[in-house]
Amino acid sequence: KRCYRTPDLKSQTCPPGEDLCYTKKWCADWCTSRGKVIELGCVATCPKVKPYEQITCCSTDNCNPHPKMKP
């Protein structure tokens, strides 16, 4: 499995057993000026969403590009 990973936003091979890609977004102190923090990576199971987070998981290679990378 290959997923985009932060902080370098490069596609990387996931560790064994981590077969899902994820995108996690949340607001930090600077949310109003810079927007949400975005974290990308690999996981074995989709994490539980906390009230202040948005999490999207997907199962195809490189299915989690940073929003600014999309055409």
Curated annotation (Swiss-Prot):
InterPro entries: Snake_3FTx, Snake_toxin-like_sf, Snake_toxin_con_site, Toxin_cobra-type
Chief localisation class: secreted
Disulfide bridge positions per record: 3-21, 14-42, 27-31, 46-57, 58-63
Annotated compartments: Secreted
Known role: Binds with high affinity to muscular (alpha-1/CHRNA1) and neuronal (alpha-7/CHRNA7) nicotinic acetylcholine receptor (nAChR) and inhibits acetylcholine from binding to the receptor, thereby impairing neuromuscular and neuronal transmission.
Similarity-based family: Belongs to the three-finger toxin family. Long-chain subfamily. Type II alpha-neurotoxin sub-subfamily.
Protein known as: Long neurotoxin 1
